[in-house]
């Protein structure tokens, strides 16, 4: 249970970190969309391990294979199956974790729920599960771009107390990808890289915030009450590994304002369309998109698996210690950026198809 996401554009991810591979089944993709493995690979390369000195040294090419649902470069409207094979698993690094639980990891809770767990690489709780999401997100991005020129750009906003100044209305993918930490503020990026280097040497980890901007989203996406657009985005983001917080629009800072200060006043643009002069609502009002940029921030905790010795317990009821072996990110933020973009794209694409089905039929 809990392995499927979406309503009309629906994905199911599968696989474990040290199994034969990981992947995704995509159901509900419109037919005749031109798509190639190379297009999907672009985002998978942004997510893959071993890409820089501040990410896990695990070396995986993460080459995607499209097994079904695409013929002669176009989608068929049938389920699309995408597989990425695991090539560089070192399961022996996890032998100690077969018995000992990693503090703040999913080891103990998975075993409490199922009575069994795959301790090799964390199994299903590993961030390698997100490969399927990123692959599906690449397809969703293309649908959104072709429909309304929708553009999704995520970037590292902060790491610990180092916070970047970024204009979410104008930031580009090229600026985000200009450095290994994926922060478009070059001065802050250098400080972030230095901080990650520091904790890596200390066998520790750190967290931070990814900000995501969705531009050119049409008005009308989202459903009243339980399927509000920001509610679905929150669920999507909080389903990612290591997430601990979600903020939309003005977020918690909005609680410091009065209604007259916070309200986004309307005006008519040159084309006679209503717009808002400010965007404290974050592009969504009443759970429905208003045509302004959709802005959100996601907090990621420090990576749970660290090399420092910590107190823990074993699954045979003993108090013990653990200094985790294996290869792990000292900071998940740089590789979380394409994951955030993918989940945003999946939500927007699903709501776009729902909007078309309900409101564009007559």
From Swiss-Prot:
Annotated NADP(+) binding sites: 47
Name recorded for this polypeptide: Chorismate synthase
Protein family per UniProt: Belongs to the chorismate synthase family.
Gene: aroC
Co-factor: note: Reduced FMN (FMNH(2)).
Keyword Lyase carried by entry: yes
A Pfam family annotated for this UniProt entry: Chorismate_synt
InterPro entries attached to this UniProt entry: Chorismate_synth (IPR000453), Chorismate_synth_AroC_sf (IPR035904), Chorismate_synthase_CS (IPR020541)
Subunit structure: Homotetramer.
């Amino acid at each position: 249970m809990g392995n499927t996401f979406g309503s009309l554009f629906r994905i199911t991810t599968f696989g474990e970190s040290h199994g034969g591979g990981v992947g995704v089944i995509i159901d509900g993709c419109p037919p005749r969309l031109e798509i190639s493995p190379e297009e999907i690979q672009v985002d998978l390369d942004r997510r893959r391990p071993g890409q820089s000195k501040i990410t896990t040294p695990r070396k995986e090419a993460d080459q995607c294979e499209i097994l079904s649902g695409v013929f002669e470069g176009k989608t068929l409207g049938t389920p699309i199956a995408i597989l990425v094979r695991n090539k560089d698993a070192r399961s022996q690094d996890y032998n100690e974790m077969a018995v000992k639980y990693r503090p703040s990891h999913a080891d103990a809770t998975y075993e409490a729920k199922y009575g069994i767990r795959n301790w090799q690489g964390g199994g299903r709780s590993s961030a390698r599960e997100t490969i399927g999401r990123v692959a599906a997100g690449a397809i969703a991005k293309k649908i959104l771009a072709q429909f309304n020129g929708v553009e999704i750009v995520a970037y590292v906003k902060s790491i610990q107390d180092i916070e970047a100044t970024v204009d979410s209305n104008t930031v580009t993918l090229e600026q985000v990808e200009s450095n290994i930490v994926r922060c478009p503020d070059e001065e802050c990026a250098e400080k972030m890289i230095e901080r990650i280097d520091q904790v890596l040497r200390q066998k520790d980890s750190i967290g931070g915030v990814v900000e995501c901007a969705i531009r050119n989203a049409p008005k009308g996406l989202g459903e009243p009450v339980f399927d509000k657009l920001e509610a679905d985005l929150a669920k999507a983001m909080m389903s990612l590994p290591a997430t601990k917080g979600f903020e939309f629009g003005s977020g918690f800072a909005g609680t410091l304002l009065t209604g007259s200060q916070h309200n986004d006043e309307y005006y008519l643009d040159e084309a006679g369309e209503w717009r808002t002069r400010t965007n404290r609502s974050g592009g969504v009002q009443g759970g429905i998109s208003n045509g302004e940029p959709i802005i959100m921030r996601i907090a990621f905790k420090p990576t749970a698996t660290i090399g420092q010795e910590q107190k823990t317990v074993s699954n045979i009821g003993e108090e013990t210690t653990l200094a985790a072996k294996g290869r792990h990110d000292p900071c998940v933020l740089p590789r979380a950026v394409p994951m955030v973009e993918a989940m945003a794209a999946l939500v927007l694409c699903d709501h776009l198809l729902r909007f078309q089905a309900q409101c564009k039929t007559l």
